[in-house]
Amino acid sequence: IVQALRQRAEHACYGYNCDDPRDAGAFCGYWQRHHGVTIAPEQTYMLPCVVTGLKLAARAFTKPGDAIVLMPPVYGPFRQSIVCNHRKPAAAPLVSDAQGRYSMDYAAIEAQLKAGSRCVFLCNPHNPVSRAWSREELQRLLNLCLAYQAVLVSDEIHADFVYQPNHFVSALTLEGNEQCVLALAAASKTFNVPGLQQAMAMSHNAQLLAALREEGECAGVT
């Protein structure tokens, strides 16, 4: 990484940047090799960071005053991304057992969906409780989203920090994901490069990606 940055800096041209198709190709290849996610470059949208993706998703998939489901305790910008866009956080708190292992409260999630929420923010793997959600857990959540026609936005930035015997499962590999899943990821955590300001939105649903891109273009994300 350092060598590549030095080589780029020596180019001595620091004008405006534009999307390079090689970036998306490299990203898609990495996710295929490391996480078994089959995604094409045209099914991605480059972003400055994952939090930007959350904010754009709030605007793309809901209207002012709508509620978005989140599962506290969760990374602070989840709630902030909802509130700053004049949406309402609809909490479905995680529950823990006697050993301190956290699980999703599906009854609470469904109650919020029944009440009208049409978007769910998922942290996968979860920050801060360090849960790598199983395929069964994620599929059960997605099935709820499908039943209530809600969009599932999955923050997967910590995908590379899952160790044996646990396994990371991307929401993009679930049955039915092409109907309502948008995933967000970045190299910033894995390679300690948040200053490079590059993340990726991914979806097998062209309409979801187009809606996110439209909000990004309106917000000046280029």
State where each predicted segment sits.
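PLP-dependent aminotransferase class I/II
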Residues: 180-222
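PLP-dependent aminotransferase-like
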Residues: 59-122, 135
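Active-site phosphate-binding strand-loop segment of PLP-dependent enzymes
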Residues: 96-164
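Short acidic capping loops at alpha-helix termini that bridge into adjacent secondary structure
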Residues: 39-44, 64-67, 178-181
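Aromatic/hydrophobic pocket-lining residues that form π-stacking "cages" and hydrophobic walls in ligand
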Residues: 78, 141, 171
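A short helix->loop->beta-strand "cap" motif at the edges of active sites that frequently abuts
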Residues: 66, 87, 147-151, 177-179
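N-terminal small-domain helix-loop-helix segment of the aminotransferase-like
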Residues: 1-49, 56, 108
